[in-house]
């Protein structure tokens, strides 16, 4: 590997952590001064790709102009063997070495140097790589210090561009918090971040290791301060020279006797017979290895490694420069000199190593004449040739004599014409570049001057952008007005199809959008991803720009290439404020994206309760809450499937969602919740009145699903136990017992069994058979669970609390009065707000959720004696106030709670608060419940007829308003023939699907 390659990988290496440099001109792409990024790769010798911690990735200059500084090169793995940081004792120092210039043998690592260790008045040498030149710096006491920001401890992050860890974070868009910056490996310090995700998972992720960026910060954190001007500039070539004076590209000879050469070669590559060619031939230095031995290439193509003491730099005389040689350390060229590039492709490739490197784009410059623009400190030349600028090894070019000297007048005239043509072209390009740069920087005076020039192109581009686009993104309204007076093309597109209005939306420039609107810019313009400016403003979170666009009539519901509307994007970005603004502007909730999700589906899928709350509060038509996807899933199905409890609660209680809608597999939301063992969703749906006996396409009810899941989990556990070791004969008699007892082991089994019991206790039919002829009990091999299910179902159906024997009641009462935690003390603590009594006062502080209903415990009240008679303990819960302050005898006499004076609407006995049933209340409930049930059955006939009528009317309305092509979305685009479709289908058509006339114009409906 050549020395330049070593330096580029290590000094300017992949993985280095960087900040903006001295020639930075890219605004806030990095997030602002002090924000940190990671070197990802090198596009060319002059361009480096950086991924900033905020997620932005772009190319930056690292030759000629320097956009970046290296904050910390430790992640690249560069190490200074034999050194030690005298403060933190890191050994060896990895990254940049800082050596005190005033103390003997005192070194610091990067962290300690910027952390103000050692004397601040002392000056230091900066040593970027082993063997590189030492750079003397000013004392830190006199230098400017700024704060680093990005992915540091405390930052909030999401997955980044190199994420490959599946759903460790809980899913795309889920957030986590960086707790510490750590080492990904021992040889790559500070190259990883330890993250605690919001879902509770935690792990180490790459931030710099091999250029990888697993994370992107959504809320940066401070990472300490650093001395900006002391950080090396990324791309400066300080390390290409060898201590012996040789550098890559130098021509060398061997002038010593054979015996001496052979002696010097010991330990430096040795000597072989094939090396005799080197004694009489000039070679070219093509590399310098880690031991500072020199790798030389010869015309034969062979490469040999030499001790530097063997080689002598060749003294080459150029044509047109007979009096000057290449030695002496001073350049033979001056700025403005005309030079001719070498014709030999292979030779120039070799010479360019370590001198700007070779790029295929340089091919047109071979043999061409150019002008020296700049001479670097290492004598490399920046040459303007063929309309571009390249860095060349001085050995790769030769001076061109003037027209009045050695060459003929005719040749001089031809050369003059060539150069004139060359630089006229370059001047024209520079003029457009200056205009774009001046517009981007807000330089009104310069823009005015440039616009007065007749040869300026007001629509000319620099780096793919026009002056209009640059001014729009940076908010320079005065320049926009100047450009509009020059009849600038406001609809000009960049390589991504973005127009000026897109750039204004990206830059959060509402005033610019107002100016562009007055200039007749299309606010609904689409880029190559079919995004409108509104899409971009929503994605960037620019609320004011969103309002401005909508105020000026921007369509709120156009779809991008993925079918997403701005509503979808606002939900994904969790911007409820923007979501509300879009809905106020009439954004269509029913439009579905390419995956079939409308806004409600999307919010349910994402588990975004705040967005769901906003959507439900502003639904234009209440039945939209039950809209189905192509697969029959409603928003409630999606919430149940993904265990988004808050979203499901909103859909049930606020949206009044139909609980019994079936998907294409005829599954209800309850089927899905039971199948996935989502206990809270099951409880919610059952208590809200979901039907328990609806059958899916296989004839299974939710109870079938629960018991099948329970049995399968038992079999899996049995298989696991058998995998550990063979079951011997002694186990055979008890195998059935083992299977039956598995139901009590493991949370998964408990969950399935408890769901089954809950369904049975709420009236699920145990006798319904599926298409295989199986009842729920046929799927349950556990006799104990079967008995429990039968008992729960029987109690629900017959209300047999009153028929139970006194001994059973007595035993049940004793059990119900025991603390559910310790079983030693009696229950004496009332949980609020649920009103259950589950533990004693000693155990209650340890309980976060009620052990009976699983609701969050917000208050704990110890049950004292009756406040009226003081003879017995309080034993009746008053509703709705939730106080328990009187015994049974006294409570029956009260019409108001003696504690809060609220009217008592219901009295709940102590035993019911413990999870049991009161015989008295059970009888009352049954007797009072019979008549409404019968009445409800009578009413159902009339209700069903009304519902069928309304459904038919709704179907008629849908046929009139739905797109005739996809039958999913509302018509919102009309053609000149009078027919219409939805916007997504209309964009893809060239003729009307109804009358087959060619589509001349598409008109969007508002």
Curated annotation (Swiss-Prot):
RING-type zinc finger locations on the chain: 819-854, 866-901, 963-996
Disulfide cross-links: none
Binding site for Zn(2+) 2: 100, 103, 118, 122
Tissue: Widely expressed at low level. Expressed at higher level in spinal cord, ovary, whole brain, and all specific brain regions examined.
Binding site for Zn(2+) 1: 85, 88, 109, 112
InterPro entries: Ankyrin_rpt, Ankyrin_rpt-contain_sf, MIB1/2_ZZ, Mib_Herc2, Mib_Herc2_sf, SH3_15, Znf_RING, Znf_RING/FYVE/PHD
GO biological process, one term: ubiquitin-dependent protein catabolic process
Catalytic activity, as annotated: S-ubiquitinyl-[E2 ubiquitin-conjugating enzyme]-L-cysteine + [acceptor protein]-L-lysine = [E2 ubiquitin-conjugating enzyme]-L-cysteine + N(6)-ubiquitinyl-[acceptor protein]-L-lysine
GO cellular component: centriolar satellite; centrosome; cytoplasm; cytoplasmic vesicle; cytosol; glutamatergic synapse; plasma membrane; postsynaptic density
Note: In epilepsy brain tissue, levels of expression are increased in the cytoplasm and microsomal fractions (endoplasmic reticulum).
Protein name: E3 ubiquitin-protein ligase MIB1
Organism: Homo sapiens (Human)
